[in-house]
Curated annotation (Swiss-Prot):
An example Gene Ontology CC term for this record: proton-transporting two-sector ATPase complex, catalytic domain
SUPFAM superfamilies from the UniProt entry: F1F0 ATP synthase subunit B, membrane domain (SSF81573), V-type ATPase subunit E-like (SSF160527)
Keyword line: ATP synthesis, Cell membrane, Hydrogen ion transport, Ion transport, Membrane, Transport
Localization, UniProt: Cell membrane
Membrane topology annotation: Peripheral membrane protein
GO molecular function, one term: ATP binding
Family to which the UniProt record says this protein belongs: Belongs to the V-ATPase E subunit family.
One Gene Ontology term from the biological process aspect of the record: proton motive force-driven plasma membrane ATP synthesis
Role summary: Component of the A-type ATP synthase that produces ATP from ADP in the presence of a proton gradient across the membrane.
Cross-referenced InterPro entries: ATP_synth_B-like_membr_sf (IPR028987), ATPase_E_C (IPR038495), ATPase_V1_Esu (IPR002842)
Major location category of this protein: membrane
Protein name listed in UniProt: A-type ATP synthase subunit E
Quaternary structure, from the entry: Has multiple subunits with at least A(3), B(3), C, D, E, F, H, I and proteolipid K(x).
Gene name of the encoded protein: atpE
C-alpha cells in the first residue's frame, strides 16, 4: 500500500510541477503579449500624436495664409478706395477749373490734337460750359492756335458732348478725331496715374 501511495504522490508531484511549468510559461507568454501590446499601443499613440501635430501645423499654416490673404485683400481694397477717391477729386477739380487756368489748357489740348490730325480745319466739341467759353473767346482761341502751330486753323464749334471737360477735336468731315477730353485722358493714363497716386500715398 505504501508503494502505491508513493507512486500516487510522485504522480501528483510531477503533475504539480507540470502545472506550475505550464502556468509559468503561460504567465510569461501573457507578459510578453502584454508588453508587445503596450509597445504597439505606444507606437500607435505616437503615430496618432505625430499625425495630429502634422495636421495641426497644416491647419495653422492654412489659417495664417488665409489671414494674410484677407489682410492683403483689405489693404488692396483700402488702397483702391483711396486711389478712386483721389481720381474723383482730380475729376472734380478739373471740372471746376477757373477760367484763367482752363482756357490755356484748352488751347494746349487743341494744339496737340490738331498736330495729330494734320489738318487746318477742325470741329471742337466738349461740354456746354467749355463750348461757351470757346465761343466767348473764339478770336483769342484761334490766335493762340495760330501762334502755337505757325498757321491759321479754321475752328468750328460743334455740338456739346457728355464730359467733365477738355476737348474733342474732329476733322471737318468727321472722319478722324482726337479725344483730349479729361475723361478720355484720365482713362488712357489711368494705369500710370494709379501708380503715381499709389506711390505718393503708400510709398
Amino acid at each position: 500500500m505504501e508503494g502505491a501511495e508513493l507512486i500516487i504522490q510522485e504522480i501528483n508531484r510531477e503533475a504539480e510541477q507540470k502545472i506550475q511549468y505550464i502556468l509559468s510559461e503561460a504567465k510569461e507568454e501573457a507578459e510578453k503579449l502584454k508588453e508587445e501590446a503596450r509597445k504597439r499601443a505606444e507606437a500607435k499613440a505616437e503615430w496618432i500624436l505625430r499625425k495630429a501635430k502634422t495636421q495641426a501645423e497644416i491647419e495653422k499654416q492654412r489659417i495664417i495664409a488665409n489671414a494674410k490673404l484677407e489682410v492683403r485683400k483689405k489693404k488692396l481694397a483700402v488702397q483702391e478706395e483711396l486711389i478712386r477717391s483721389v481720381i474723383e477729386s482730380l475729376k472734380e477739380r478739373l471740372a471746376n477749373l477757373p477760367e484763367d487756368e482752363y482756357f490755356p489748357m484748352l488751347v494746349e489740348l487743341t494744339v496737340k490734337a490738331v498736330e495729330e490730325l494734320g489738318t487746318d480745319k477742325v470741329v471742337v466739341r466738349s461740354n456746354e460750359r467749355t463750348l461757351k467759353l470757346i465761343v466767348e473767346r473764339l478770336s483769342e482761341f484761334r490766335e493762340k492756335l495760330r501762334e502755337a502751330l505757325g498757321k491759321d486753323v479754321e475752328v468750328t464749334v460743334g455740338e456739346p458732348i457728355q464730359t467733365i471737360g477738355g476737348i474733342l477735336v474732329e476733322s471737318s468731315d468727321g472722319t478722324v478725331r482726337v479725344d483730349n477730353t479729361f475723361d478720355s485722358r484720365i482713362e488712357r493714363f489711368e494705369s500710370d496715374l494709379r501708380a503715381t497716386i499709389a506711390k505718393a500715398l503708400f510709398g
